[in-house]
Amino acid sequence: MKKYIFMTLTVALLGLTACTEDAFDRINKDYEHPSPEAVPAALQLTDAIMSTGFSTVSGDFAFYLSSLNEQEIGMGNNQLMFAEMRNSSEWAASTTFNNVWNSIYGNLQNIRQMQSKIENEVPGNVGQFDILGMAQVLEAVNFGVLTDMFGDIPYSEAVQGQGNLQPKLDAQKDVYTGILATLDKAIGNLEKGKSLTSAGNQDIAYKGVASKWLAAAHALKARYLLHKLAVEPNVLQK
């Protein structure tokens, strides 16, 4: 009898040993928070567009610039007067600039991830030249707003995560040069991806129509060439 009990316990223990590793693998896998690599670039596109529209273009900068320009000149200083009544230090508070600075660089991290997945042909992202071009247009907009507002900014060494926590400042004229080069890449990829529909409904700006992104890229290229002329007047002679 003891012999049978011993054999039964041995088999049971062996069975537990065999399944323990698999069970722990399942338990330790985080299904709620997949790694960035597991998320297709197309799904990140929506967030990149939203963040660019609401944080970069229509965020704090839009309020402060309108107050310092249109409202200050045309409305009897109303906005500035009310701002001073609310908080006399509002215009010098660190959050005035830190919030939008951090949100734009956070958005750029997302945009660079999208590009990396397509360029490195991560499964599920292969050949999506239309999305790659869209991401490059969005990158140009975000860096463009940053340098328009702050002048010299981290650019060539920026958005490297833990790889570089103290990126150098690049001169504004060099940032504009980089932006124009990025837009050239975007135009090439959008031309290549004209017939693709990789973005689908994730493109909440132009509904996945590459030709509209192309038009935006050309318009932005004209804008930033003019901005570059302001800091490097002889640029057209090169």
Sequence positions of predicted segments:
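Membrane-proximal, proline-rich intrinsically disordered regions
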Residues: 4, 19-73
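Enrichment for repetitive, rod-forming helical segments
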Residues: 9-10, 33, 228-230
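Alpha-helical transmembrane segments and their juxtamembrane interfaces
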Residues: 12-13, 31, 57, 233
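Sec-dependent bacterial lipoprotein signal peptides
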Residues: 1-17
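Structured, solvent-exposed acidic/aromatic patches
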Residues: 37-42, 76-238
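Intrinsically disordered, low-complexity segments enriched in small/polar residues
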Residues: 13, 57, 72-76, 81
